[in-house]
């Protein structure tokens, strides 16, 4: 049970018209934040995170350039977030995960989200690749999402902590995403 006595629907939108001057709720808009903020392009498969949130009018097509042409693929939200027992919620740390480092040197602006068609369709079939590190002559930095929803063997931490860096415990940052981007306790 949710422990609530009732639910309420938001008021309908009523555009201001001169003849409706006495009406209530004219031009009333409901504020919202788009979350998760990470998106992926369905065409080029690149991950995209805007620097300061996304407005609904900004969503739509990928603006990455390939051979001087825009990709124009459809952007969709990535369906993974992190939350803790205290109710904090934030975007999954894609850059930290793929680099296995809580403070990666790479900026994470060239991460690719790919599905392996030869696997079952579970988390182990989703791969994140850092194309920036791969271009620098390093071995490709690539990692799948296997076990990201699992607890560690001792149930005292998460798979994220166990597989990020040795001797580093990935802790909740206290994010209160519902209050705005970058709001933490």
Regions found by a protein language model. Name each.
Residues 1-185:
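Extended, Lys/Arg-rich, non-catalytic nucleic-acid recognition/anchoring regions
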